[in-house]
Amino acid sequence: MATEPNEINLRMTQTRMKQIEDTTFKIRRKHDDMYTYLINDIEATEMYPDTETPFRMKSSLNNTYIQVKCQIPKLIMQPPLYNNDMYPLNHNSTNFLEDRPFNYLCNFDWFEFLSRSKDELGMHYNMIRDLISMSSQTRYSNIWSNISGIIMYLRQYKRGFALRSILIRLLTYWNNFPFFDTWDGFKDVLPKTSTAWPLLFYAFMSVAFDYICENISEGDAIVCFQNHLENAQISYQDTKLEKKNGYTLWLKYECHNLRVALTPRYDYTGTVYGNFLKDTTEYIITDEFEENEIKMKNILNPSFYKILQQLRREIKTVEDIIRLLTICYSARDDRTYYGTLMELAISKAIKPQVAGSIVPKPIPTSWLQKDPKIVLSAKYPSTSFLSQMQEFYRRYYPALQREIDVHALSASFINFLSTASAGVGIELPEEIINMVKDKRLLYLLKKGSGKRVLQEALLVERYNDLDPIINDFVRLIKIVVRKQIERRQRGIAGIPNNVLKINQVTYEANKPFSKIARAPSHGKQSGNASDIHDLLFYTTQEDVSHIEVNGKRQMRGIVISSADVKGMDTHIQINAAMNQHLGAIEILDGIQYDVGPFRQTRAVIQDIQGNVYERNLNGGQQAIAFGLANFSQTTGINSKYFGQIPNQEGTFPSGLITTSNHHTQMLTLLIETAATTFTNEFGKSIAIAHLMILGDDVSLMLHGNDKDVNFFMKYLVEKFSQLGLILERDESRNFGVFLQQHVINGRFNGFSNRIAIFTSEDYKTRKSVQESCTEYNALIDDVIFRTYNVRKLLQFQRIHQFVVLSKYIFRVQNYKYEKLKAKLATRLNVFEYDLKPHNDSRENVQNQNMLRFIGIQIPYTYFQCSGGGEIPPESFQRKDGSFTYEYSIYSPKGKWLRKFLYDISCTIDEPKFRIDDEIMRMYNLDICDFLIQYNMLNIQEEIRATIIDRELISKLAMNLESLENSNARMISRRASESLRIMGIKLPANGVYGYQINERLVKVLQNIQQSDYEVKMVGDALFTAIMEKFDSHKVRMEKGDRLHNFTLDFSDKSDRLVINKKMIALHNISISKNMAPYSDAWMLYTCLNHTYNASSELSTALAHSQGHFKSFQYDRDMFAESVKIASKHGIGSLPMELFFEASNIRDSAQLKWIEAIKYYIQFKDYLYPYSINPRRLFFIPEQVSSVSSLLNQDNIPADANKKALMFRRAYAYVLSHPFRISGAKAIFVDDRIS
């Protein structure tokens, strides 16, 4: 078979851009044209005319040749007919039968099913239609646009001929697209179409994406897609879940089989400083390897298993292991979300699972004399393990009490009222209905009344009533569906606000636990490699040794346990969960804390010895005790098919505020207590080198010989069982997993298949173009260090994002349509739509005012503009024929990308720093600037803002404010109003008194509405287009002058010093994208991780980004404060009012004043841009790290000048790492590269 040509790196010219835009416009305009585009691919069919007959291609693992084919199984091409026995009902038709063949969508003839009548199918008629709709998951546009974006990229870069040929064969089977996915679900299904095809087309996109990024080869991609096809023959998602664990059972053996591996050494900062040959001999549980081999052979499809075994024989290094794992991940899952009817998922999602022991109920030791159900203290039976855990928990009480912020408690409930669902719907109060005149606003309020913050504002008068709380405690809790990638669908309890109010008290008491305990991990807070520092460190320990124990040779050293706590929410028994609430009652003793109807009181208490006495109880303690008395809450679902389906009592409601905190605390106490009792019972200690816990994720680093570690882990499993939990063991000396982050012998093995570019959990959520671009960039940020070839990833993003997001549809009154179309068509491709008039006369006034669809194609370059899509720009041709430098995937965002406008404008013949109007027009950059300046792609938000009644919002905000024991918001509003009278208007979201208002506005802004009610071109925008669209020019902005610089690497006399990182990583990749001499490798090894900046320089560096030291402030509000201080003086009345409006007091105010003074003095040394820690990950984020790349004679002595130079040079190096050579760079002002 033919092979692909060598890699090509196309540069952007006006001609090529026009060709991409016109092709995209054509295929996005008509489905027929898109279908024709996809199947008319002569290059692909000529190179691979037959992909069904086995042929040889290279694998990504050491270029090993493998036999591949793509044969669509007969059951997919000729699917069975649907019958109701596929989803049988129980005997009284109140739910699905417990013992049924499928929980997810199975394979059957889709077209034939849709032809069946409701009379024939009965209840299944609607249920199965809804089940099929779960397969519609497209994140942007539709399936076919996404596939077109993939194919357009592959054609542009002359790649993927075999995959393209396979797609042609799939699509020509129907002679058209087999179905269409829209906002309203699937339509136009063709005969002989299996219900598996939507997910299989996502699978095709998934393997194609992995191939594009070189995570796998094209041959691997075909193998993986064939595996997906075979899995889909009966029930695709059920089968994937069954086989999921089989794909990586070989990992531990292959690590062991290496015997030795070149391994990086990390210092205390997490930086590589050397390497060594590590003994990879594994910690082995009896017969573990043999059992895993048998499981793999039985679980995996024979065709995939055969190739897996072939590739395993090629493994020689840790990098090879990670390569093969990546292939297995691509074959295992397809980046789709596991979605089904909640009625089919309930048994796995929320139904209580009985495992191990029944946890004993705590014995009350004190209670209210008048109501013994209100228990104030209790102890677990002394023989139970929970009794020992409870005593261990008590050791934390004093520290927890010290950390509680008593002054913040009154406002804490309001802060928890998010814009998420409140779990229960309400009727709008009559008073509110009477206040609303606009039907559109009434619609928004009705939709938004189910959101926490708005619902509480509407029902605030009932805040102090006990009856609503009692009602909500006995109410059947609504289940909110959560779909996940690679994990079965979950059910989150939609907790009502009143239950949240009670539960929040326990949370406040225990919130500091994560701060004061050793084990709780704060997870992915930084987003960079510091999150996996512990795994990097403990998988690279050298202290493994062989010892003799009773004549047997054993290993001693670090063992990493990545044990899985199975279904923690469904396994936690009520009696076990009560421990935290009982502790909270004691922790909160002695403070002033009122909660709703529960107020400070003097209560008569009776204890277990029969003593009766009086005691002060605060509202928080009473609220918890009330909650405990009603803790046996039933979780269930309100089924649209079966009515109310109650769940058995005992499930831990995963929607509680305390859920993550409770699980973290419970597991920490369990393991710490077990380590203590282990020593007491057996007279030997187990060395826990490190322990990380967050929610139900546990990573345990143990030190000892194999026998002792195994003995302790068996003991730990038993202790988990005594609490009704199942701990599935997974120990290794070579690898560990925590929070889905996997490290193997010091290498980060990121799970690329967990990042979904093409699918979304909720495909119906509509976002603006700007929001979609931000989301797409965030997805790319997540996948960079999980991907082998990030240059190809970036090339793909530029084309794919343009194809799926460039079609923008809005509405305009009919009488404006022709004028607007004519004006826009002078520079843009315009999508035209016919008008469907009310009557025959198109001149009728009613028809003239009708809203009519019109669309534009957003220019290709918009997606690479600052303020637009902000994809790092590619290499563009200038007027003189030269090309700009391409910006790398690590490039900063924000104002930094405006440098590209000057890069493309300045030439050797015309080096003057300027924006060239001609080149702006040539690449439509002036149009992009117009779209951004006039917010033309965010029409919905502006129209929604005109609907929302601010007076009503203020009333609702005041309702919530009445719950606080403070007048700070009122003082803030008065100060803001005084400033307004003086002509100073502060941003509403920065004024403390209006922050509740802004949260309520956000609820209404985010409610989904139909296109018929939003996205209409208003008069102001219409006028702007008609008057300024043609003549708009890109203007130079304040601060742009600082873009006039370059780095000159031509002085070969000033050489870069070869450092320890370069030597250590000469043959090692610590992540997939960090192969030696790759962009990430160059940045990691050449930037200085340990630059020691002085205090003065640190302050200057923070200022250059717009910060002051480590002080955090709202940037918009700070800008306003600088204006006020500059005009009126720092000690002026307006400044006092500003601080009152912002609720900035005491030490924070002093810091703010200090920041203002510094800013005013050094305002010319600002160069802000944004970098995302996830995008850089291993790469140093410290701007000063660039110092090692700069000619030292060129660096100024002044701290602010030095900081500004470092900041500019750092952005340049991140954007153009390929320019780094053996020489240090000279910083050159007043010259564009």
Swiss-Prot record:
The keyword Nucleotide-binding applies. Keywords: Hydrolase, Nucleotide-binding, Nucleotidyltransferase, RNA-directed RNA polymerase, Transferase, Viral RNA replication. The keyword Hydrolase applies. It catalyses: RNA(n) + a ribonucleoside 5'-triphosphate = RNA(n+1) + diphosphate. InterPro entries: RdRP_C (IPR054002), RdRP_N (IPR054006). Pfam families: CPV_RdRP_C, CPV_RdRP_N, CPV_RdRP_pol_dom. It comes from the Viruses. Residues 1-775 form the RdRp catalytic domain. GO terms for molecular function: hydrolase activity; nucleotide binding; RNA-directed RNA polymerase activity. Its EC number is 2.7.7.48. RNA-directed RNA polymerase that is involved in transcription and genome replication. Following infection, it catalyzes the synthesis of fully conservative plus strands. After core assembly, which consists in recruitment of one capped plus-strand for each genomic segments and polymerase complexes, the polymerase switches mode and catalyzes the synthesis of complementary minus-strands. Interacts with VP6. Belongs to the reoviridae RNA-directed RNA polymerase family. This is RNA-directed RNA polymerase VP2.
